[in-house]
Each structure stands twice: as structure tokens, then as C-alpha cells.
A protein has these predicted regions:
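N-terminal short beta-loop-beta anion/metal-coordinating cradle
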Residues: 2-108
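Conserved active-site and cofactor/substrate-binding residues in soluble primary-metabolism enzymes
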Residues: 36-43, 113, 117, 173, ...
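Internal, conserved structured core segments that host functional sites
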Residues: 101, 109-160, 182
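Short, solvent-exposed amphipathic alpha-helical segments in soluble enzyme
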Residues: 43-48, 121-124, 211-212
Length: 212
């Protein structure tokens, strides 16, 4: 395992387990927290990871980004009786397939601190895996019933990218989460990035939402 040195020459918080050679990869990102109603966004990534037997290629060291009194590690006992500490995870998995694009999937808890440093680490993952585009996933509470099909909306800050993909430009103004901050960092790094988000009925926004 090795830590990554970013383009600026500064040591990042990315710990690599392997350096894969991928085919035109896309980076798909979601984080538990403010923009993950019903755990729809992170649940979608976990479903893809499980269905395609994805392998972990890297992780972001949680030490700098969490208050462990707020997000406490868990103690597990292994099958042979050994005690193991499981820390909050921020893992990058990869899926290599026969499609035009391989997938890099990054998910975990929304960091609680040092967001700019965290975003630098995500940018490094995108650069080091040579991702052609970043797709962020999100879910928000909406005034819709569960009986209607879930509607996915997309946007891109880049006018050219929005036009090419038929997406809206962002219109939201106000407090933001890590996804909004990450979009700014990716734009600054000249990495194409789009946002996909789904509305979740307000009465199922807390527990995992199977419809999302």
C-alpha cells in the first residue's frame, strides 16, 4: 500500500492498493449524509459493487476527515475469535467490463472536516485512474409519493457539457454539502463532472429507501 503524491507535489490522503490500467473510466461518487436521502445514492453504488464483484483499489484515510467521537469505529469479532476495529470507510472500487467505459466507484461517509483537502484526494483518484468524467449521485427529500416512478434529474456546471448531454445548468443557491464543494474542485481541475439526483418521498427519507 502506498500514499499518493498529488500533482502539486503534496502528499494526499489516498492509500492505493493497486494502480489499475483502465479503459476510458468514469468515476461515480456518492456520500452518506446531507445529500443521500433514504441512502439512495450510496445504496446505488453499493448495489453495483455487490452485483459486479468489484474490487477495492484505494481508500481515503479517514483520520483527517472525521471526529471519531461523532463517527465512532466499530468493533467486530472475526470467525476465528479475533477482535478487529472497523474505521469509517471511504473506499474506491473498480469494475472492468466489456463496455466502452470501466467504472471507478467511490463512496462512504460525508467527511466532517477539512473538505478542501478531502476534495483534493478525490481529484487525485480521478487523475490517477485517468477518468474521463466524474458523475456524482445524490438524493433529496421531495413532495412525491412512493407510487410514482422515481425521477432522476441531471445538471452540469459546464455550459458545453450541459448542452452536449442535454442537461440543465445548476440553479441552487444556499448552503451546500460535500458534493457541491467537490463539483467546484473538479471544475477547477478541468475534470468534466455532472450531477444526477433523485427525489425521495419525505416519509421514507430516513431509513434505506428500496424504491430509490
Amino acid at each position: 500500500m502506498t500514499y499518493s503524491v498529488g500533482n502539486s507535489g503534496v502528499m494526499t490522503e489516498v492509500i492505493w492498493e493497486e494502480g489499475p490500467s483502465l479503459q476510458s473510466p468514469l468515476l461515480v461518487v456518492a456520500f452518506e449524509g446531507w445529500f443521500d436521502a433514504g441512502e439512495c445514492a450510496t445504496g446505488a453504488i453499493q448495489w453495483i459493487v455487490d452485483q459486479h464483484d468489484a474490487r477495492r483499489i484505494a481508500r481515503i484515510d479517514p483520520e483527517e476527515f472525521f471526529d471519531f467521537q461523532e463517527n465512532r469505529p466499530h468493533v467486530d469479532i472475526t470467525a476465528d475469535g479475533e477482535r478487529r476495529i472497523k474505521w469509517p470507510s471511504l473506499d474506491a472500487h473498480v469494475i472492468e467490463n466489456d463496455f466502452p467505459h470501466d467504472l471507478v466507484l467511490l463512496s462512504g461517509l460525508e467527511p466532517r472536516m477539512r473538505w478542501r483537502t478531502f476534495c483534493d484526494s478525490v481529484v487525485e483518484i480521478a487523475h490517477d485512474t485517468k477518468c474521463e468524467m466524474v458523475v456524482t449521485l445524490g438524493a433529496m427529500v421531495a413532495g412525491i409519493p412512493h407510487s410514482r416512478p422515481a425521477e432522476v434529474k441531471g445538471s452540469a456546471a459546464s455550459a458545453e457539457l450541459a448542452r452536449r448531454l442535454g442537461l440543465d445548468r445548476p440553479s441552487y443557491q444556499g448552503p451546500t454539502g460535500i458534493i457541491g464543494t467537490l463539483h467546484d474542485a473538479l471544475d477547477s481541475a478541468d475534470l468534466p463532472v455532472i450531477s444526477l439526483r433523485v427525489g425521495v418521498p419525505h416519509y421514507v427519507a430516513g431509513p434505506p429507501n428500496p424504491k430509490g
